[in-house]
UniProtKB/Swiss-Prot annotation:
Gene3D superfamilies, per database record: 1.10.10.350, HUPs
Pfam family, one: tRNA-synt_1c
Record keywords, A-Z: Aminoacyl-tRNA synthetase, ATP-binding, Cytoplasm, Ligase, Metal-binding, Nucleotide-binding, Protein biosynthesis, Zinc
Predominant localisation class: cytoplasm
GO function terms (MF aspect): ATP binding; glutamate-tRNA ligase activity; tRNA binding; zinc ion binding
GO cellular component: cytosol
Family: Belongs to the class-I aminoacyl-tRNA synthetase family. Glutamate--tRNA ligase type 1 subfamily.
Binding-site residues, Zn(2+): C99, C101, C126, E128
Reaction(s) the record says it catalyses: tRNA(Glu) + L-glutamate + ATP = L-glutamyl-tRNA(Glu) + AMP + diphosphate
The protein, known as: Glutamate--tRNA ligase
Length: 467
């Protein structure tokens, strides 16, 4: 049985965007499902645009998403001698030829074709030259067949066929000696034994040229699966104007990697009506044949909903660790306050991102917050002073300070004073948190502890007395 080998081959000319991440994810899932090998290859033949910073960003994005690779990263820039060797093989076998046409001549041919109403393509001027022209600059072209059909069965799109007379004699080596993309990708996939190529559907038109190269070199043609692109809400191709498109930007906005993975895989693939998938679920259930043929529309609200789910159901200890940098960005030392895991537990239910959780946690670590003006007008009236005094006295005399015992004290005060719970809880919440929107007041008090709770109640009492 042939070993299953898949690859993700990004160009390091920018960050890892969500479209590339989804392609990587589909390749990774199929490799893991079929117990195959997942290879990372960096396509950096465009030396002018490729940067180490982009390579680092791609690797960081892959690692954050948990898409581990079995081989690589391989760099095309390290393989130029290999490509030259294969160019020479094609020249020696007559399957490639040197083209001496100048850029000006080619442009004139193109303009003439357009004037004649023909599709611009190389006219084969140098295809049958008898010999070399020493010292004259040249490119190397692949001698494509002019008759017949090149077809393949795309795992997503089905049967796709191209008439060979529509295909150009592809340039495989530029005049400066560097190889072209369509050539090197075939050499890499062939020599690395890639069995399935999953990539964006903007590569469909490259596929017949690449298949002809495989056949000319005597290598087996891999299976192809062309994934539809991702669109914004306006049905235009997803870009920066639609919001964040970089994977690490979502990390910095407080998203969890499992939420983005879950969202991206569902953007084009489905398994019944299920919405929530762990990585283990995905490996078991994923099928490239179940990826839809139409473009997926990126829905930030759906991603936010998924992220909220993963925060709500996440391990508080892990979330606490992830929350630390967000707190530090806000000038908070998480070691200088209540237990962070306990803090997280009170915020999981209502936080949609780690950024929201960090903002919601600030009151735990700061006493110098100001009170919400509307809340002050409504709740911090002179009549609330005896209530604060009673809470302080009851907490001081209570040996136990759990959320259950705190709740019992609130109930006692309500019964004694003939008040509703909100009439006691809201002034207390303002004293402890600065406003009326906060987690359960009983849990907040337990996390802050008796001493800090009473300090904040006394501060609020002094505020009310000052009027």
């Amino acid at each position: 049985m042939t070993e299953v080998r898949l690859r993700f081959a990004p160009s390091p000319t920018g960050y890892l965007h969500v479209g590339g991440a989804r392609t990587a994810l589909f390749n990774w899932l199929l490799a893991r499902k079929q117990k195959g090998t997942f290879i990372l290859r960096i396509e950096d033949t465009d030396v002018a645009r490729s940067t180490q910073e982009s390579v680092d960003a791609i690797l960081q994005g892959m690692e954050w998403l948990g898409l581990d690779w079995d081989e690589g990263p391989y760099y095309q820039s390290d393989r130029f001698p290999v490509y030259k060797e294969f160019v020479q093989k094609l020249l020696d076998s007559g399957k490639a030829y040197k083209c001496y046409c100048t850029p000006e001549e080619l442009e004139a041919k193109r303009e003439q074709a357009l004037m004649d109403g023909r599709k611009p393509k190389y006219d084969g001027t140098c295809r049958e030259l008898a010999g070399d022209v020493p010292g004259k600059p040249h490119v190397v072209r692949f001698r494509a067949p002019h008759e017949g059909v090149t077809a393949f069965d795309d795992l997503i799109k089905g049967r796709i066929a191209f008439n060979n007379d529509e295909l150009d004699d592809l340039i495989i080596q530029r005049s400066d000696g560097t190889p072209t993309y369509n050539f090197v990708v075939v050499i890499d996939d062939a020599t690395m034994g890639i069995t399935t190529v999953i990539r964006g559907d903007d590569h469909v038109n490259n596929t017949p040229r690449q298949i002809l190269l495989y056949e000319a070199l005597g290598y087996p043609v891999p299976h192809f699966a062309h994934v539809p692109m991702i669109l914004g809400a306006d049905k235009a191709r997803l870009s920066k104007r639609h919001g964040a498109t970089g994977v690490m930007a979502y990390r910095d906005m407080g998203y969890l990697p499992e939420a983005l993975v879950n969202y991206l895989v569902r953007l084009g693939w489905s398994f019944g009506d299920e919405e929530i998938f762990s990585k283990e679920d995905l490996i078991e259930k994923f099928s490239i044949e179940q990826v839809g043929r139409s473009a997926g529309v990126f829905n930030p609200d759906k991603l936010l909903w998924l992220n909220a789910h993963y925060i709500k159901t996440g391990d508080p200890s892990r979330l606490a660790g992830l929350l630390v940098p967000f707190l530090r960005e806000r000038g908070v030392d998480p070691t200088g306050g209540p237990d962070l895991v306990a803090v997280v537990k009170t915020l999981q239910e209502r936080s949609r991102t780690l950024l929201e959780m960090a903002d919601g946690a600030l009151f735990y670590f700061r006493r110098d917050f100001s009170y919400d003006e509307k809340a002050v007008e409504k709740f911090l009236t002179p009549e609330v002073s005896p209530l604060y005094e009673l809470l302080i006295a009851k907490f001081a005399s209570s040996a136990d300070f759990t959320h259950q015992s705190i709740e019992q004290i609130f109930k006692e005060i309500c019964e004694e004073k003939g008040l509703k719970l909100g009439q006691v809880a809201q002034p207390a919440r303002i004293a402890l948190c600065g406003g009326t929107v906060a987690p359960s007041i009983f849990e907040v008090m337990e996390v802050l502890g008796k001493e800090e709770t009473n300090l904040r109640l006394e501060k609020a009492l002094a505020f009310v007395r000052r009027g």
